[in-house]
Amino acid sequence: MENFFNQFFENIGEDKNREGLKETPKRVQELWKFLYKGYKEDPKVALKSAYFQGVCDEMIVAQNIEFYSTCEHHLLPFFGNISVGYIPKEKIVGISAIAKLIEIYSKRLQIQERLTTQIAETFDEIIEPRGVIVVCEAKHLCMSMQGVQKQNAIIKTSVLRGLFKKDPKTRAEFMQLLKS
């Protein structure tokens, strides 16, 4: 890692021995361990260990769960909120498990579209609800800091499964709950 940073500093014209940079390789290495810890965790295990049999057959919504991730194209952050709605069949998941699922997938090199899909697909596979919807809203620094440099752009993605995909009324109920 130290060789990588020495080469990086040299390529951008920095002095690797400058006081403020001496510990940078170690600090960044620790930061990267945290930012990409999702590779060391199994999202399916996180959900499997946090559900229980339930009797609820109405919509459950976890709204505005904040996340931070890294764009795999430019290695710049993107961040925002994810909302998950589901209609249980037999299993109800602990709310913190939804946040954990989001954290595991977001702590990897990502694109927003895949992040949204992975959350929905894993939730659908493990919890087997009658329907699940995931909506992700994010700001991408790769869009703000370079290229088109649009500071206020927000990208929205959604993935729908089961009743949310088949029934417009169910989808509309979820969207109304997000507004309230």
Curated annotation (Swiss-Prot):
Q: Which UniProt keywords apply?
A: GTP-binding, Hydrolase, Metal-binding, Nucleotide-binding, One-carbon metabolism, Zinc
UniProt GO MF annotations: GTP binding; GTP cyclohydrolase I activity; zinc ion binding
Task: Please list the disulfide bridges.
Answer: none
Source organism per entry reads Helicobacter pylori (strain G27)
Q: Which Pfam families match?
A: GTP_cyclohydroI
InterPro entries according to UniProt = GTP-CH-I_C/QueF (IPR043133), GTP-CH-I_N (IPR043134), GTP_CycHdrlase_I (IPR001474), GTP_CycHdrlase_I_CS (IPR018234), GTP_CycHdrlase_I_dom (IPR020602)
One GO term describing the cellular component: cytoplasm
User: What GO terms in the biological process aspect are recorded for it?
Assistant: one-carbon metabolic process; tetrahydrobiopterin biosynthetic process; tetrahydrofolate biosynthetic process
Family annotation (SUPFAM superfamilies): Tetrahydrobiopterin biosynthesis enzymes-like
What's its EC? Answer: 3.5.4.16
UniProt binding sites for Zn(2+): 71, 74, 142
| Gene name for this UniProt entry | folE
Give the family, as the similarity comment puts it: Belongs to the GTP cyclohydrolase I family.
Quaternary structure per UniProt?
Homomer.
What reaction gets catalysed by this protein?
GTP + H2O = 7,8-dihydroneopterin 3'-triphosphate + formate + H(+)
Q: Which PROSITE patterns match?
A: GTP_CYCLOHYDROL_1_1, GTP_CYCLOHYDROL_1_2
Q: What is this protein called?
A: GTP cyclohydrolase 1
Q: In which pathway does it act?
A: Cofactor biosynthesis; 7,8-dihydroneopterin triphosphate biosynthesis; 7,8-dihydroneopterin triphosphate from GTP: step 1/1
